[in-house]
Amino acid sequence: MGEPAFTSFPSPPVLGKLKRNMMPWALQKKREIHMAKAHRRRAARSALPMRLTSCIFRRPVTRIRSHPDNQVRRRKGDEHLEKPQQLCAYRRLQALQPCSSQGEGSSPLHLESVLSILAPGTAGESLDRAGAERVRIPLEPTPGRFPAVAGGPTPGMGCQLPPPLSGQLVTPADIRRQARRVKKARERLAKALQADRLARQAEMLTGG
């Protein structure tokens, strides 16, 4: 008896090399989540940025400055608001009254003293002219003319200008006198600044 003939079956055609994923399932899931997030970030980055301040500032904002040419956008109710004032500093400045070198309260300068300081030789003449013109003024008001108001400007005063100060001689005594005045004024200013600083510190301590 002969040997049975060997029958071979043809193998199916191989379409490609089979690939097997060696990555664990948990790691593969994490990789898919990471890739999905990266894809969403790329899609969001490609869009134009959104102005988040448009929902806050609905009107154009202008800077407020004290200049006549500036136009500030404001509401109708803001027109009647008053500017804030520093009341404490204002009261301290009111308490600081001008005083003389002896510490006494100084009164306002009169016209005669001002003229004597500016031009000692012409003070009496200008006052005499002013007195003469005051005598000429009629007591009863005339048509088209009003009498001088009490406390107002007196006719004739200020019309006579003093001569220039270049013709006056400055002596060493005048220089020393002026230096003493400047020194006393600086001392008063230093005392006032020190009092203001102490008052500010007291306000900060009481307010805090």
UniProtKB/Swiss-Prot annotation:
MF (Gene Ontology): methyl-CpG binding
One record GO biological process: DNA methylation-dependent constitutive heterochromatin formation
Domain of life: Eukaryota
Cellular compartments per GO CC: nucleus
Entry coiled-coil feature ranges: none
Pfam families linked: MBD_C (PF14048), MBDa (PF16564)
InterPro entries: MBD2/MBD3_p55-bd, MeCpG-bd_2/3_C_dom
Note: The MBD3L proteins are encoded by strongly repeated regions of the 19p13 chromosome. The exact number of functional copies is unclear, and some of them may represent pseudogenes.
Family the UniProt entry places it in: Belongs to the MBD3L family.
Name listed for the protein in its UniProt record: Methyl-CpG-binding domain protein 3-like 5
Biological source species: Homo sapiens
